[in-house]
Amino acid sequence: MSSDKSIEKNTDTIASEVHEGDNHSNNLGSMEEEIKSTPSDQYEEIAIIPTEPLHSDKELNDKQQSLGHEAPTNVSREEPIGISGDEDTQITEQNVNEQRQETREPSSEIDLNEPLDVEKDVTTDVQAPNGLNIEKEYDAVKENEKVYADTKEVVSSPENREVTGKNSGGEKSSSSKFLDDESGTTTAANANDISISSEVTPERSSENDNNQIHITNEVAAGINLNENKEQKAAIEDGPVTAENLSSETARKVPPIPTQIINEKGDNSSENEVSAIPTTSSPPLPPRQNVATSTSPKLPPRGKQREQPPKTKNAVPPPLEEEMKSEKFRKNFEETKRNSYHHVPLTGSKTAQLESTAEINLIASRYRKTSHHLNKEGEETRESLQEGQSFLKSTFTSFLENLSEYNEVENVNEEDREMFKIDWSFWTQVVNDYATVASNEPENLEAHVTNGIPPQIRGIIWQLMANSKSREMEDIYETLLDTECLHEATIRRDLRRTKFVAEDKMESLYKVIKVYSVYDPDVGYTQGMGFIAAPLLINCENEAESFGLLVGLMKNYGLRELFLPGMPGLMLMLYQFDRLLEEHSPSLYNRLIREGISSTMYATQWFLTFFAYKFPLEFVLRIFDIVFVEGIEVLLKFAVNLMLKNEETLVKLRFDELLDFLKDELFNYYLMGNQDDASVVQMGLSNGNSFKGNDDGTFSYNVDLFVHDAMTGVYITPLTLRRYRGEYVEIHEKEQKKEDHYESLRIQNHQLQREAQKLEHDYSILNKENISAANELIQNRLNMEMLLDEKNDLINTITDIKSQIEEEIRKQNLPNPDASLPKADLREDLERTISRNNEVMRENGQLEERITELQAEIDELININKEQVSTASLLERDSKAKGRKGWTGFKKVFK
């Protein structure tokens, strides 16, 4: 947009320079002689005329209306009008007539397929209405530059300044006084420059300016030529210089509207040009009586000539106020309709396509197709070009045969309908689809909405999808005999495709099978038969339908709907939800409250193009619009169905609501429901209607369905791109959350495995501890038994010692048996000694045993001390887990 505005400004600047160059080149030649021959006392006529007009606005408007013309914009306060005689009226009418004749002459035809030259276009637009050559005019100005300098020196003399000052002071509100009061910075030289310009201003320049304003006012209705008061005050407050005067003069003439510029550069716009009134402009009042405060722009000097001054366009009122004018609305609608017929001055057809593709699905679809084509190799592009040529030749042959049908007297109803088709438009589509899609998307949408003629439907589809190529036919022939893993599944699902004839069933199987081999990532998904069947029916052979299917999948983005995970389908469902929320928030919120998701009922709509429900003829009309606008247009049909059934849907509960969405949502377009239809529906009910069931009990109104979807739901690529961004952002956030949850699940699983391992190790240690405790208890019992044996041995030793002492005591007593024979005593003593020795030996052995047992006791005591601490720890663990395995062990230590 900024480039368009800059070009318009440059065009306005060049146009103003052309007018001024023409004026100066015609009048500067005689300027020197006039000034030299004029005495100083006659400079009174050149004095600055006061700004107050002698004719009021009402008088001027009444005079214009008395001649049968529209009242022009107030020029007396805005436009510089030089001094003229009584012949102004005739000159003005002649100039206006010449200008109108030149404007109505169409310029050379523009080839839309070639890139535009901005500089060349601007030059042509400027020269066309005026018949001028800018370079020649500048050369003429350069030749007269010296004369102009001499003229300024003569007028700038002290005598001339005095005369000018006197004359200026004699006026009611002179310009010199105005400049002194307002700015206080104007010099005498500047005042002389202004006075010279007032005299030198040619009559024709002012007339052309006025007439040009009048013509512009009639063509571009609604453009207010009155200056903004704030801008005017700002200009008047500043210092008055030659640059300010030039800028103000240029500002007073409004810029040439874009529509008029385009009309001059296109032969097809003669109707729009003819809309300009052909009546001559009404005569203006004598210019010596009209006040002026500014002079036209002086010829530039030196380097200033290379830099044209910037124009200041008049500020129009707000759009809301201008839309109140019926003429402005009419002109706005004409400009909107013709915006596709004219190539803008930006100089590039691609730039127009890029801007249109942001708001129009047709232009967006063509841009995507072009991008896919540019990515292909040279051989592929040549093959596609050959396919395009073949389709065009096929269409030409069909038209030739069609002309022969016109010669037949007796034709049936179908042939009559065929003759009513706008074959000239479809010929234009076939020959140059790029131009039609780029410049006339609304016209193309209207024709496609009414339906592509069945006789050329396959040709148009292949041209739009750019799918016809010898390369794709060779691929089909090569893969036809290749084995497929999905053969049984394909044959089973094809039995559900009821609108395909038996003789076409095998061909349909081959097409789907070859595609599953051609694209192994997609393979085969249930629902492909509904997509491939209409293609096969409208193509000449299987190879063409295969190429068209590949084009839909690859170029139109249908492949993403059938990939594993169906990312494209999820995106379309999200876009459907957002569009439904935008068009009917109440219905969307109702579905959310009931827990109804679009995945429950809308997936088959997008996967089968509604073919699972509607008859073949109905589906073909949907395919027509899909090929021209893309699969995004399915969102229009889906949202339209929901909006038409909104009143019923908001009243149902979950179960009934889900059943209605699956089975009864399409009943709105049954022919039997026309009693409740609107006026538009009744008007379309006379169109095509197709049966919904084989028994013919129901029939659908396809024209009404398509018309409602295309006019009732407005979708732009910009909106879909915004929804795509939202979906990607949400999906990325969900993916990050899912990744985080997955990492937590993995970490949790690892921790669980560690816990299980620790529990296993703990069970092993627990078993070892239990065995050690049991062994400790057994040792404790053994120790107690040894202590008992020790005590018994000690008691035995004590008894033996007492016996020995008793025996010794007895021996020390007087032997009453001394009288006994010595031999007996000796033997008894020996026996006693030997017995004593034996007892001593046994006693030594017992003491050694006691020593050993004491050592064992000490060792067991040490072990017992160590085990006591271990037992206390185990006892606390057993209490924590509710186990009572150490109760007996504690009793032992007590």
From Swiss-Prot:
Alphabetized UniProt keyword annotations: Coiled coil, Cytoplasm, ER-Golgi transport, Exocytosis, GTPase activation, Phosphoprotein, Protein transport, Transport
PROSITE patterns membership: TBC_RABGAP (PS50086)
Domain Rab-GAP TBC: 451-630
GO molecular function, one term: GTPase activator activity
Main localization category: cytoplasm
Positions carrying Phosphothreonine: 89
Keyword Nucleotidyltransferase found: no
Subcellular location: Cytoplasm; Bud; Bud neck
Coiled-coil portions: 732-872
One GO cellular component, as annotated: cytoplasm
Residue numbers carrying Phosphoserine: 25, 30, 389
Range of residues in the leader sequence: none
Keyword Lipid biosynthesis: no
Function description: GTPase-activating protein which accelerates the GTP hydrolysis rate of YPT1 and SEC4. Involved in ER to Golgi trafficking and polarized exocytosis.
Record-given protein name: GTPase-activating protein GYP5
Gene source species: Saccharomyces cerevisiae (strain ATCC 204508 / S288c) (Baker's yeast)
Lineage summary: Eukaryota, Fungi, Dikarya, Ascomycota, Saccharomycotina
Gene: GYP5
